[in-house]
Amino acid sequence: MNTEILGVAVQIVLMVVLAYPLGRYIARVYKGEKTWSDFMAPIERVIYKICGINPQEEMNWKQFLKALLILNAFWFVWGMVLLVSQGWLPLNPDGNGAQTPDQAFNTCISFMVNCNLQHYSGESGLTYFTQLFVIMLFQFITAATGMAAMAGVMKSMAAKSTQTIGNFWHFLVISCTRILLPLSLVVGFILILQGTPMGFDGRMQLTTLEGQEQMVSQGPTAAIVPIKQLGTNGGGYFGVNSSHPLENPTYLTNMVECWSILIIPMAMVLALGFYTNRRKLGYSIFGVMLFAYLAGVFINVGQEMGGNPRISEMGIAQDHGAMEGKEVRLGAGATALWSVTTTVTSNGSVNGMHDSTMPLSGMVEMLNMQINTWFGGVGVGWLNYYTFIIMAVFISGLMVGRTPEFLGKKVEAREMKIATFVALLHPFVILVFTAISSYVYTHHPDFVESEGGWLNNLGFHGLSEQLYEYTSSAANNGSGFEGLGDNTYFWNWTCGIVLILSRFIPIVGQVAIAGLLAQKKFIPESAGTLKTDTVTFAVMTFAVIFIVAALSFFPVHALSTIAEHLSL
């Protein structure tokens, strides 16, 4: 047990320590300063020339968003065409068939918005061709899209007054070539050394220790897993994700993959401070996020390593904790750490089954996604926190009788309305769709039965499974309580709608706020200015997040995870 706790502590320390130099590097990349990765410049120029991009052309916030949305619309069509025709495409040695239109819609939307919700199993639901030219391609593009959006916001924050926020295409390309690709190559090399497969052969036929014949899938796993983790994507190459011994063979690969989930989101927060020359602001935001993350780790590690009281009542020893749904080679501690790490970000990959975690652990996992502000996805995670900063500035200004200002710009009714709409959209979408699914399940049992029955667990946990699915979709996470039978018309279409609403409306709102503030006249700091880089303001922001985001979900948790915990 002590060894497991030590492993958890080492991973967290590595994340925090290495996030600092990476944050400095990311800030320099987006500022256009000289870095070791300048050798990528000729490749970038070729990309710009082929695509007809002028990287020096500045965009206002409307042009920036237009480019972002056009890019996503194009790749959606690309993905749909390939997924519904993959059975006839090359690199398909196992003869996997095409996806149905509803499943392809859900898959394509899910990976296009960086969620990676999977209503299929990777070994049989995709081919090597679509794994590479849809899934892996989208995992680079969507991660870079979020990073580009944050780069534009950082540029607007650093300027005293400007009409432009940078070039979306330029930020997108350098996010791939100078940040995501180099890190992916390093992680991929480690995975190959540890035994993760990398090739294009079909299934292997093996004889197990019991003498049974078994077919084992392989493929270009080591190429896809690194960006799956680093881009906070999370879509597993195999159906059970990083629980699979070929996707995550050893404790070392588990540490590397878990580290990969959080390193860029952490670094992006620190990059904000370096880019804007306001390090104290970056540190204060980082501190709030780290506090919330560590609180979740403390709860989940304690819950999972403490075991299940129902099993203890039967007189069965649980020296290794609550091991249901966990890999013996990894242990309860490492699985608990991963469960928090993957949900404070929009990653969603798993190394154990969240459906089998203790009720309070499941509540923490869901709350991380429902708050959707602690580190979050690469780039987009900080933008969600930015929304609450605007709200906290406005509320604090009203409380002390000062004009609300953020970084020398007045925060007025227009910005506050957008921020409020974005903040309330998240709980609204989750709770409304959960209510709809619960209503359909209760009042239309024939329809539900025609789709396989949906729930493998009734009662409190059945509600948790439905709530988790929509929470994961809205938070662009992609993990799930897998007791839910989700590859149906109802879940494919409704989750797809939630994915679209919860990805693009917040990004549009957040970039719009940044663009509107950037255009305003800069007001120098004075004795009456509300400082936003202090511990007091950090606590105020945390309080606003807790009240607006967390408490919105208390009633539904009282009916699901909390009720289940009290029933043990």
From Swiss-Prot:
Cellular component, GO, one term: plasma membrane
The organism's place on the tree of life at top rank: Bacteria
Any one Gene Ontology molecular-function term assigned to this protein's record: potassium ion binding
Keywords for this protein: Cell inner membrane, Cell membrane, Ion transport, Membrane, Potassium, Potassium transport, Transmembrane, Transmembrane helix, Transport
Membrane topology listed for this record: Multi-pass membrane protein
PANTHER family linked to this entry: POTASSIUM-TRANSPORTING ATPASE A CHAIN, POTASSIUM-TRANSPORTING ATPASE POTASSIUM-BINDING SUBUNIT
Function: Part of the high-affinity ATP-driven potassium transport (or Kdp) system, which catalyzes the hydrolysis of ATP coupled with the electrogenic transport of potassium into the cytoplasm. This subunit binds the periplasmic potassium ions and delivers the ions to the membrane domain of KdpB through an intramembrane tunnel.
Family statement: Belongs to the KdpA family.
Name of the molecule in the record: Potassium-transporting ATPase potassium-binding subunit
Organism: Bacteroides fragilis (strain ATCC 25285 / DSM 2151 / CCUG 4856 / JCM 11019 / LMG 10263 / NCTC 9343 / Onslow / VPI 2553 / EN-2)
